[in-house]
Every structure is written in structure tokens, then in C-alpha cells.
């Protein structure tokens, strides 16, 4: 595992332990069970495909470890509304604070402002975080195969499905893809950013896409900035994309989102 992921895992496990002390899982689970039902994340993506459109998972991200501050004028509800107006199918909201300046409060606020399903974008190491995600309204969670062993990934996926959520399985090489295909989720995200080096190349998606069964929903993640990038990934069968930084840097996010999708259609 990389130095970056090792550092992230260390602080995440400390965060989880502190959260468990502050709020036992039984109390949190009551909130999760009482929350309004999840909005179908995979269903929303497939509805776009059925209409002949690309499906965009639009990301709300204030900062990142590799780029620092991405957007100073950061208003999650307004950004969510801009993405919805621009034609996004779903939202992705960063909730990790140390590396991304994210927050569960941003997830709650963004989701409340729109009708789109929302992914809790975070480093998941414990089923407690899954319950926490649902209690805060998340419709989908992320499993990063590079961060977990098979048993951990299965436990987290099972917990999410038990709460009615969808799961995005993230891979960035053949070994991780083979492991992800043993899980139940139909949604496989190919991260073009190597989490061990933080280098980005669309060639990762081009290499892995042909190995993903046609009944799975492929998601291209990271390094997507232009309609040409979308078209390049579409040539290997991808029609769902997770885009954050390039849209977060735009003054008019709704117009930029619309332009990205329209010019690529």
C-alpha cells in the first residue's frame, strides 16, 4: 500500500474510533433506518443511458491532496443546484476533512438542495461509516479496492446493501478489477489516478474497460476535463463519468456542465 493511503488509513481509523466513542452505532443505526429511503443511484445513471445520454456523476470538492484548494467560493447547495441544472445524473460529495476539506454537513446540504442521488465520497474502512453515510442521507458509498482486503470490502458492501444503498467499486489495475468482480455491486469505477503515485492517465480506463463484463456499469473517474476526454473513454464503452476538479474550477458551473455533456453527446 502506498505512503499516501497508509497515512489516510491511519487518520481515518482514528476518526472512526473517536466517532464510535462519541456516538455508538446503535444510536446511529436508528437514524439510518429512520431516514427517507435512498434515491436510486444506479437507477439514475441507467435512466440517462436509456435516454441515449452520457451519465455524469458531478463532484462537489473543495480541495485535494494533489491540487490543494480547488474552489474558494464553495457553496455545496448552490453547486448541487448548478450540477442539476447542467444535466448531471448524480452527485459525489467529498466528506473527508484532513485531505479534501470535506464534511458530512456538505453532503446533507447538497443533497437537500436537489433531487439527485448522492455518493458519500470518502475512504471507507469500517461498516460504521456506512451507517453514518445513510444517517446523513447518502444514497451510495465508495469502496476503494486498493484500501481494503476482500473480507473488508465484502463487509462494507453488505452493510450498504442492507441499508438500501448502491456501491461504487473503485479499481485502478487488473488485480483490483478481478477482486471487485467477485463482489455484488454492478458499478465499477476505473480511477485514472494511481493512488500510490497520484499520477493520472486515461490509458488506465482504456486498458481495463475491455475486461469489464457488459452487464456492469462502468464509470470513468479522474483526469476528465474536456468533451474529447469523454469521447476518448466512450470509444472503449464507457458512458458514465465522474468529474470534479475541471467543473469545480469554472465560474459558471451549470453552463460548464451543460457544455461538457452537450459537446460530448
Swiss-Prot record:
Pathway: Amino-acid biosynthesis; L-tryptophan biosynthesis; L-tryptophan from chorismate: step 4/5. One of its GO terms (molecular function) is phosphoribosylanthranilate isomerase activity. Keywords: Amino-acid biosynthesis, Aromatic amino acid biosynthesis, Decarboxylase, Lyase, Tryptophan biosynthesis. Its EC number is 4.1.1.48. One of its GO terms (biological process) is L-tryptophan biosynthetic process. Pfam families: IGPS. It catalyses: 1-(2-carboxyphenylamino)-1-deoxy-D-ribulose 5-phosphate + H(+) = (1S,2R)-1-C-(indol-3-yl)glycerol 3-phosphate + CO2 + H2O. Gene3D superfamilies: Aldolase class I. Disulfide bonds: none annotated. It is an enzyme of class 4 (lyase). NCBIfam families: PRK00278.1-2, PRK00278.1-6, PRK00278.2-4. This is Indole-3-glycerol phosphate synthase. It comes from Rhodopseudomonas palustris (strain HaA2).
Amino acid at each position: 500500500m502506498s505512503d499516501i493511503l497508509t497515512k489516510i488509513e491511519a487518520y481515518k481509523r482514528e476518526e472512526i474510533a473517536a466517532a464510535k466513542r462519541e456516538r455508538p452505532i446503535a444510536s446511529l443505526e436508528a437514524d439510518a433506518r429512520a431516514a427517507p429511503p435512498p434515491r436510486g443511484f444506479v437507477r439514475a445513471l441507467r435512466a440517462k443511458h436509456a435516454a441515449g445520454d452520457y451519465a455524469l456523476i458531478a463532484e462537489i470538492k473543495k480541495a485535494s491532496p494533489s491540487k490543494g484548494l480547488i474552489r474558494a467560493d464553495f457553496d455545496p447547495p448552490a453547486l448541487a443546484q448548478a450540477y442539476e441544472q447542467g444535466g448531471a445524473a448524480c452527485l459525489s460529495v467529498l466528506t473527508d476533512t484532513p485531505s479534501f476539506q470535506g464534511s458530512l454537513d456538505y453532503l446533507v446540504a447538497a443533497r437537500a438542495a436537489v433531487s439527485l442521488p448522492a455518493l458519500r465520497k470518502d475512504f471507507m474502512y469500517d461498516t460504521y461509516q456506512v451507517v453514518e453515510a445513510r444517517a446523513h442521507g447518502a444514497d451510495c458509498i465508495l469502496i476503494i479496492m486498493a484500501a481494503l482486503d476482500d473480507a473488508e470490502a465484502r463487509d462494507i458492501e453488505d452493510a450498504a446493501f442492507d441499508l438500501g444503498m448502491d456501491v461504487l467499486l473503485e479499481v485502478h489495475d487488473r488485480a483490483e478489477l478481478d477482486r471487485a468482480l467477485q463482489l455484488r455491486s454492478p458499478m465499477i469505477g476505473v480511477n485514472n489516478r494511481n493512488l500510490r503515485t497520484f499520477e493520472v492517465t486515461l490509458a488506465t480506463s482504456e486498458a481495463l474497460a475491455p475486461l469489464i463484463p457488459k452487464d456492469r456499469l462502468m464509470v470513468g473517474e479522474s483526469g476528465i476535463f474536456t468533451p474529447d476526454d469523454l469521447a476518448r473513454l466512450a470509444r472503449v464503452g464507457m458512458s458514465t463519468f465522474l468529474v470534479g476538479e475541471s467543473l469545480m474550477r469554472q465560474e459558471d458551473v451549470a453552463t460548464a456542465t451543460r457544455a461538457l455533456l452537450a459537446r460530448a453527446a
